[in-house]
Regions:
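Bacterial Sec-dependent N-terminal signal peptides
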Residues: 1-21
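Accessory carbohydrate-recognition regions in carbohydrate-active enzymes
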Residues: 20-250
Length: 250
């Protein structure tokens, strides 16, 4: 009987140490519920939205390819970027979307080349905070939403070639790097219909670290001699040397 009681106490103690800390009703919410969906079988058709109630913009880790209504699926093992989204459902798809992705090593823009393996064991998802370890780049990404934007924090390894990719997606987009202000501005027109002819979603990214590398990207072509691109599919790459554990805020 004493052994049984000791076992029960040990089990409860272990559970207490690993149980999630609840500070409010929002902590009962798991944004990952309903994300194991695909076109052939809907099991929720949700995505892990990081957002404030009635926020203007939502953010989501993007496992699907550009234009895929199933932007995040639980059984995927690669993240291509962290997307600003306004998507009501995968069937209706998205509008006004663009993505941000930290990478290390080679300066690449292609969504498959920049993608990184990740594990749900190294992923934290709540409505008000998201964190994941990008194994291929050895970078930790954290996101906290605001009413109209979000705060990003990237924790880089020691690397002479650390970058952030900004992908304004296709359908007509514009991106400009402003090194003197540690800033990237631009717009995306990506949509799935039902928007005005002059629709644009403008964005501004401000970094707390100066750029030592800059490049504009037009239709997949990376040009280090240009600071802006205005084309069917525009984007940008900025880079810097980082120390082990150095955090870059956006």
């Amino acid at each position: 009987m004493k052994k049984l009681a000791l076992f029960a106490f040990t089990l409860l103690s272990a559970w207490a140490m690993t149980a999630k800390t609840i500070t409010g009703p929002v902590d009962y919410v798991s944004p990952l519920v309903g994300t194991q969906s695909k076109h052939a079988l809907s099991t929720g058709n949700t995505y892990p939205a990081i957002a404030l109630p009635w926020g203007m913009n939502f953010w989501v880790p993007q496992t699907g390819k550009m234009g895929d209504g199933w932007a995040y699926t639980y059984d995927a093992d690669k993240i291509r970027g962290f997307k600003q989204t306004h998507q009501p459902s995968p069937w209706i798809n998205d509008y006004g979307q663009f993505s941000i992705m930290p990478i290390t090593g080679k300066a690449v823009f292609d969504q498959d080349q920049r993608a990184s393996w990740f594990s749900h064991k190294a992923e934290t998802a709540t409505p008000y905070y998201y964190k994941v370890y990008l194994a291929d780049h050895d970078v930790v990404t954290e996101i906290a939403p605001t009413e109209r934007a979000a705060a990003f924090r990237f924790t880089f390894p020691e690397n002479d070639h650390s970058y952030v990719v900004v992908d304004a997606f296709d359908n007509g987009s514009f991106v400009k790097v402003i090194p003197s202000e540690n800033k990237i501005i631009g717009y995306t027109t990506k949509n799935s219909g039902g928007v005005p002819a002059n629709f644009k979603n403008y964005f501004v990214l401000e970094f707390d670290k100066p750029f030592t590398y800059t490049a504009a990207v037009a239709n997949g072509n990376i040009d280090t001699n240009k600071l802006e691109a205005n084309d069917k599919h525009a984007g940008a790459l900025i880079g810097f040397k980082t120390r082990k554990g150095e955090q870059v805020n956006v």
